[in-house]
């Protein structure tokens, strides 16, 4: 616990420093800096409070041990031993809690997300599975009390999606859905398969934290905006005016096209939200190669061999290959009952990070 104790003291020192900074009139006048420092202060508060509890109970243990060495009073000895046992139990519990609190936090965990789902290998069946995944996440979001907004979609003639982009807003969305990044494989008999053979198809899911103004500052001069006429599905509702928008962030080359809404203004607003998130995602990676790898990890190539999870319909089975978890309740999972998988992934992630913390 000694190494952990040193880390905790450093956290407490930083917390004190932050409290001084956010009381400084110069910092208060700079709203972006004040927001950033206040957020950091808030993220450390629980750890510091637990650490203060830990120091207090450790002092109680020390005092009780000293008292037991010095007293000859039987009643006092009995009372002190009882208090000491309780204090040691509390100390052990606080040590466990502090270890978890010291696990490096993902700064994006509290953010809303942009989710991109794409039909990949498997043609029409892959696009139908992309639609099934969309419905699965929609139902899960409803259970969580989150709001889902479709910001872009490209539908197929069979009722699936070549791709669909969602904005999901609510409490700690990224912390729960970030593990959905990757290729999702489905094994089932397609509705178009007359012989009843099981086919394997893939859809990919990409999850990006929504960038806040404090995260990324895009100079308007760095954005090129092109407008064009949107094309409705199958010639339906084709807009005769130039309402579709394509935004290019010149320094990074990131392009976002948006034609989901009827008005250019609405498409501009949605395109900017996605562009900000992609640029933020880009700048989180210091090198171009690291960024490319992250985007590849997030969106996936769609190759059938690259998978994080398999959905086997004939056997009503879902397997998450990263943690070796198999659940025989595919019907419930596709209805949005994702808690068991997501909680298992969070525990596995925390366990790995805790092991790294202990080995540092």
Curated annotation (Swiss-Prot):
One of its GO terms (molecular function) is translation release factor activity, codon specific. Methylated by PrmC. Methylation increases the termination efficiency of RF1. The keyword Disulfide bond does not apply. Transmembrane segments: none annotated. GO terms for cellular component: cytoplasm. The modification N5-methylglutamine is found at residue 236. It holds the Pfam family PCRF. It is found in: Cytoplasm. Keywords: Cytoplasm, Methylation, Protein biosynthesis. The keyword Protein biosynthesis applies. It comes from the Bacteria. Belongs to the prokaryotic/mitochondrial release factor family. Peptide chain release factor 1 directs the termination of translation in response to the peptide chain termination codons UAG and UAA. PANTHER family: LD18447P. This is Peptide chain release factor 1.
């Amino acid at each position: 616990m000694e190494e952990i104790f040193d880390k905790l003291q450093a956290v407490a020192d930083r917390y004190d420093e932050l409290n001084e900074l956010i009381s400084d009139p110069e910092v208060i006048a700079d709203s972006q800096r004040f927001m950033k420092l206040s957020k950091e202060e808030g993220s450390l508060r629980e750890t510091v409070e637990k650490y203060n509890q830990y120091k207090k109970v450790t002092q109680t243990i020390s005092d009780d041990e000293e008292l037991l060495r010095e007293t000859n009073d039987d009643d006092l000895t009995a009372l002190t031993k009882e208090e000491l046992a309780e204090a040691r139990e509390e100390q052990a519990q606080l040590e466990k809690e502090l270890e978890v609190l010291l696990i490096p936090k993902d700064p994006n965990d509290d953010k809303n997300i942009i989710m991109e789902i794409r039909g990949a290998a498997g043609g029409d069946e892959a696009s139908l599975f992309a639609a099934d995944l969309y419905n699965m996440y929609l139902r899960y979001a409803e259970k969580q009390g989150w709001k889902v907004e479709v910001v872009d979609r490209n539908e197929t003639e069979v009722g699936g999606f070549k791709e669909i982009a969602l904005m999901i807003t609510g409490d700690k969305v990224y912390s729960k859905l970030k593990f959905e990044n990757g290729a999702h494989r489905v094994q089932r008999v397609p509705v178009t398969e007359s012989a009843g053979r099981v086919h394997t198809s893939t859809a990919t899911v990409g999850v990006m934290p929504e960038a806040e103004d404090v995260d990324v500052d895009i100079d308007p001069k760095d954005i090129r905006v092109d407008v064009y006429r949107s094309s409705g599905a199958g010639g339906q509702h084709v807009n005769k005016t130039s309402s579709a928008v394509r935004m290019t962030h010149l320094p990074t080359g990131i392009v976002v096209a948006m034609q989901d809404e009827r008005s250019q203004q609405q498409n501009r607003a949605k395109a900017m939200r996605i562009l900000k998130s992609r640029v933020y995602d880009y700048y989180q990676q210091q090198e171009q190669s690291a960024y490319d790898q992250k985007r590849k990890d997030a969106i996936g190539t769609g190759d059938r061999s690259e998978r994080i999870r398999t959905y086997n319909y004939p056997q009503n089975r879902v397997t998450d290959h990263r943690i070796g978890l198999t659940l025989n309740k595919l019907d419930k999972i596709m209805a949005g009952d994702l808690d068991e998988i997501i909680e298992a992934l969070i525990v596995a992630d925390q366990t790995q990070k805790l092991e790294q913390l202990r080995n540092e």
